[in-house]
Amino acid sequence: MRVITRFAPSPTGSLHLGGARTALFNWLFARRHGGQFLLRMEDTDQERSSETVAQSIIEDMAWLGLHHDQDVVIQSARRERHTQVAEELLARGKAYYCYCSEDDIAAEKLRHENEGKHYRHHCPSRDANHAQSGTAGVLRLKSPENREIKFTDGVYGEISVSSEQIDDMVILRSNGHPTYLLAVVVDDHDMCITHIIRGSDHITNTIKQMLLAEAMGWDNPQFCHIPLIHDEGGAKLSKRNRAPGVHEYRELGFLPEAVCNYLLRMGWSHKDEEIITMQSATQLFSIEKIGTSHSCLDSKKLLFLNHHYMNQKTELEILGLLLPFLEQELGHTVAETKLARLSLGVKKLMERAKTLADLARDSVFYVQNIPISVDDDAKQVILKSSELLAKLVGAMSQIEPKTWTKDFLSSYIKEWTKSNDVVISDVYHLLRAAIAGRLSTPSISEVMEILGQEECISRLRFFLNS
């Protein structure tokens, strides 16, 4: 049997971390077994679904490297097929039309809840084998009576639910539109899905979907439910209490390798390894290694992973990834000559930067035109050091261009401070402030060598004359 998995998001909102992890686990399982990973857009909620959102989900998945096989299946385009199955269930006596009003059902349900009882809707039309003419009703599947419904979950083991807990579910609305539950079962069957990996909040749906497949005489896929992701404090994520989506992590400057590694370790493990590449994961991934406890967001771990993967890149690779963030920081494109300058200093800056956005902010001084941006601390240093600034302009101008190297600059500055009775830390602070616009940089002598004598003196003069 060839393994076929699927990811089936609803295009009503961006790809969040829980959805991305579900997609990742399905993708890895398919790749691990030489199978296929399919993508289906579950857009039965036509009012809230958006083609733009669907496209953004596809783009975010591609950014993560989770490329799907075959064409994307659009659920709403298969409405005729879903309706056909519903009519077949009606013809087989497995479904019936219900004409009870929603208000009456809600009132009856509330009465049972107030009495501490479970409400299971019993429609007077349950045993009728035809629709009432001129009346709009919903089509319901007949749930079994007095039976335990069981299945072996790939993560949680055996799960059992009494049929008395399962309502006769609606499969066609009164307007004739198929419901989500019906569409999912039909699509999974027609797409030959063998394994479904999804969040544990779907277990109730799974029981109902199993009954639908059973009524049609279809085999059920292997279900694997994974624990949900909680926030850093251990609370469940919700619409109000949500984590950034995949697109937001992209904009914050995280690498797809880091996000995938992070998602993988939220629920799945291999020994005590934290760094697991996708290449390794496709060889190691198995359902058996998924835990049953919920996972919590850990921003420090994500930053650690991102820092690691950033430092696996070459200077050329990093520059390509960094360029959009630099241009956003600057508000304009970066000249090739300035990128070449940055390439000489970017590795040092990567030692501390955790994201591409961090790296862009830390490295922007290499590619800025005069006047460069200056943070508040650097401004204060410049404002109170005008006399020292004038002396430094003169001192830097006396250096022979051919000797403008980090080693010479380092020794020259030390000697100059001694002979001029100046505190060396004051000199370094001022050079950083006026040349880099901040007080924290790699070795200022190294920065000055990369920028060059002319650029450094021009920056010093600008602040002297301001």
UniProtKB/Swiss-Prot annotation:
Catalytic activity annotation: tRNA(Glu) + L-glutamate + ATP = L-glutamyl-tRNA(Glu) + AMP + diphosphate
Localization per Swiss-Prot or TrEMBL: Cytoplasm
Quaternary structure note: Monomer.
Lineage summary: Bacteria, Pseudomonadati, Pseudomonadota, Alphaproteobacteria, Rickettsiales
Locus of motif 'HIGH' region: 9-19
Protein name, UniProt field: Glutamate--tRNA ligase 2
Signal sequence interval, chain numbering: none
Assigned keywords, A-Z: Aminoacyl-tRNA synthetase, ATP-binding, Cytoplasm, Ligase, Nucleotide-binding, Protein biosynthesis
Binding positions for ATP per the UniProt entry: 239
EC number: 6.1.1.17
Database matches in CDD domains: GluRS_core (cd00808)
Family, per entry: Belongs to the class-I aminoacyl-tRNA synthetase family. Glutamate--tRNA ligase type 1 subfamily.
InterPro entries: aa-tRNA-synth_I_cd-bd, aa-tRNA-synth_I_codon-bd_sub2, aa-tRNA-synth_I_CS, aa_tRNA-synth_I_cd-bd_sf, Glu-tRNA-ligase_bac/mito, Glu/Gln-tRNA-synth, Glu/Gln-tRNA-synth_Ib_cat-dom, GluQ/Sye
PROSITE patterns associated with the record: AA_TRNA_LIGASE_I (PS00178)
Gene: gltX2
Protein species of origin: Anaplasma marginale (strain St. Maries)
